[in-house]
Every structure is written in structure tokens, then in C-alpha cells.
Amino acid sequence: MIVYEYPFNERIRTLLRLEDLYEKFAFFIGQDHPQHHHVALATMFEMLEVAGRADLKSDLLQELERQKQTLLGFKSNPNVEAEMLDAILFDLDRISAALIASQGKTGQHIRENEWLMSIRGRTIIPGGACEFDLPSYYAWQHDSAEQRLADIHKWFTPLAPLFDAIGMVLRLLRESGRPVKMIAQTGSYQQMLQGKAYQMLRLNIDEALGAIPEISANKYMLWIRFTSQDGDMKPKAFEGDVPFELSLCSF
């Protein structure tokens, strides 16, 4: 099954973009080659670019507190597993405390590092990070893998509380949705949402069908049009019914 996610607002769109960047970053720092570490560093610069567009820290703290208060309301519910609820509440407190303790603007420690900023300025230029452009960076790439990883972890560590908070918020949002089996007649599906404030939808589909969803939505209406891709040809409308699972997620 392939899971497609579609954000209903810019706030969730930003969180999903940052999560995607973090997953790429985590993959590349799990490797040892200098080129992998170059991409990890470039990805970290992209994280700063996306995270710097909004005051994410205060927004995430408010959302974590809202979720905590909501979950506290389930403490007296006998149908809720107390141990699991306590574990989530503990994680919320831990993540919030770490985010509060993180000082200053997101990524300020990197922006104040002139060497890293010189690398960032060259990496946005196609082919701009060659050894004759950045000899000191070229020398760093010839350090041991252990030393490079230690440096990257040192630079990323102040950002970790932000990404822990993003992960928790998106986890709770995803878990709020309940999958419902649907069929798109002749590759098309519409649903009235009656103005309910959803934040995200999740669509599960069997990859063997070869159907690719193109999604558009607002608080009143959801449209899904399935297409198919044949090699390097332009996607075309999918011919036939498409079974899928739809989850509408909201806090």
C-alpha cells in the first residue's frame, strides 16, 4: 500500500515539508561517504529555510499544550488504556520542556557560524561547492567519517527539540483519522465536508493498481482524480474504478 497525505492548510504543509527534510537528513547521516554528508548538510540548510518562514516554536508549544489538555480529559474514561495515555502525556511534557529550553531563534547557531554560512551560500549555486570554491570544506570532507558525523550531529542537536515536536504533532494528527473504504467511480471521487475544519487527509491505495491520486480540497469539498503514468508520458485519467481507504484527520 502507498499512503498519500494532503494538508488542508499552510501550517500542516510546513510541518510535512520539514518532516520530509528530516527523513532525508536522517538517511544521509546514516551513511559514511563524504557525498552523503554533503547532502545531509545541504538538507539541514533547507530545514532552516523552511523553518524560518514562520514562528514554529510558539505554534508547536501551543498545539502540544492543547493536545495535553484534550488527553487529560480522557483520564477518567474507563475505555481508555491508562498506561498508553500516561505514556503519551509523558512524551508531551518531555518534548514541550525540551522545546521551551531551546534558546533563541530556530537555527540561530548555524546562522552565526560564518563557515557554515559560506557553505550554504555556495550550495545554492549549481556546482558551487567545488574544491576550488570552498577549499576548507573540501578538506573537511576528507576528515574521517566519524569526525564529519560528530560535527553534523553537533550542528543539528539544537534543532532536535523542534523536530521532536513536529513528529509528535503529526503523529497525533495522523492517529485522529479513521480509515474508511471508498471507491472512485471511473477514477473520480468527490465528498462534501460541510465546513468541518480538517487539517489533513490520508489516502491508502494498492500500488499494484497503478492509480495516482491528484487531490484538491477546502473546508467544503474534497476532490480526488486518479491518473496513471506510462513511462515518460504525461499522466492521463485513470480508466476504471479505484478502491482506496480515506482518513480525514483533525485535532
Swiss-Prot record:
Gene3D superfamilies for this protein: YacF-like (1.10.3900.10), YacF-like domains (2.60.440.10)
Cross-referenced InterPro entries: ZapD (IPR009777), ZapD_C (IPR027462), ZapD_sf (IPR036268)
Subcellular location: Cytoplasm
Keyword line: Cell cycle, Cell division, Cytoplasm, Septation
GO biological process, one term: division septum assembly
Pfam families noted in UniProt: ZapD
Highest taxon listed in the record's lineage: Bacteria
UniProt GO cellular component terms: cell division site; cytoplasm
UniProt keyword Cell division present: yes
Similarity comment: Belongs to the ZapD family.
Function of the molecule: Cell division factor that enhances FtsZ-ring assembly. Directly interacts with FtsZ and promotes bundling of FtsZ protofilaments, with a reduction in FtsZ GTPase activity.
Subunit structure, as described in the record: Interacts with FtsZ.
Protein name: Cell division protein ZapD
Organism: Janthinobacterium sp. (strain Marseille)
Phylogenetic placement of the source organism: Bacteria, Pseudomonadati, Pseudomonadota, Betaproteobacteria, Burkholderiales
